[in-house]
Amino acid sequence: MYPRLKIYLKRIEENTRVIRQLCAGYGIRVMGVTKACCGAPELAEAYQAGGLAMIGDSRVANLKKMENIKAEKWLIRPPMLSEIEDLVRYADVSLQSEMETVRAINKECEKQRKRHKIILMMDLGDIREGYVDEEELIAAAVETEKLSHVDLYGIGTNLTCFSFIQADEEKMERLAEMRKKVENAAGHTLEIVSGGNSAALDLMMRGGICEGVDNFRLGESLLFGKERSRYTFLPGTRNDGFILECEVVEAKVKPSLPWGTAGVDSYGRKPVFTNRGEKRKKVICAIGRQDFDAETATPVDEGILILGASSDHLMLDVTDSVKEYKVGDIVELRLGYFSVLRAFTSPYVEKIFLKK
């Protein structure tokens, strides 16, 4: 049945091993993020096989899927108050920026007779989650340390996700300095200072991560073998862990340019087309924007050009391919991060996990 997404777990495992070893050389421990694959336990197992002991996701529902995975599990998005019961049940660690939530977690832990680890987040410019005021963060740390059923595990920051503010030496030094202030105020040595995501790898390799920052939350780099700051591939990794197969439903010769009065698309944009001639071999595949992101997909056949997609049609120019595509043929696409995220979320895409 098509479309279907093939996930090559051994390739992801090898990426994980290479990047874990790379980070270890700089004193950085890695937590593997599964959110692009909707918390698939198979992905968590590939991370574990690559040497990771910490697994994280942004949704409690995804952590629930990994209930039987023997790893330290993190919730990497501040939880809703309405899901605290399940958070305590399925997560060992969570990133927090509101003491009201931390208090609710402490109360629920008492009910469930469990303990939960808290990482307090500091906003260093991305204006997403975290404390901006240092004194507020310190006060939160002191209060957390006094609570009966939660542990002050560490502090962290998030960059390059909303405003796409980059990690730099100054921001990492400020985070490390905050570690000292929190430890002095709370009278407690922090086990974790989480300095960011795959976008921080470039800074790390340039020697820009100072002592005191010891953890990264990585997803994209493990899955696709590249850091997110400059989008360069890391040595020894590969980017073919996710191959989408889609079926051709129309194959015809058509002009490269549309004709008639042009309007805007469903996203408020006016499409732009390049004149490649009056006779181009084009195919339509039965998949669209509801199922994947055409902008972060690359045809395996280098002779294919992605023209664009509507909600459930993918238009391709196959004129330069050595293969003569016809109805019923299969086109393979190598997927990037957002394309994988959308494909995993779509119920119309079959997922096939391959242990190779």
What residue spans do the PLM features occupy?
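Active-site-proximal beta-alpha core segment in soluble small-molecule metabolic enzymes
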Residues: 6, 28-173, 177, 185
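Glycine-rich phosphate/diphosphate-binding loops that line cofactor/substrate pockets in enzymes
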Residues: 20-24, 113-114
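Active-site anion/phosphate-binding pocket segments in diverse small-molecule metabolic enzymes
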Residues: 173-356
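Short aromatic-glycine motifs in intrinsically disordered, low-complexity regions
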Residues: 1-2, 139-142, 146, 229-239
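N-terminal capping/small domains of soluble enzymes
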Residues: 16-18, 25, 36-49, 62-63, ...
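Alpha-helical packing segments of well-folded alpha/beta enzyme cores
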Residues: 12-15, 19, 178
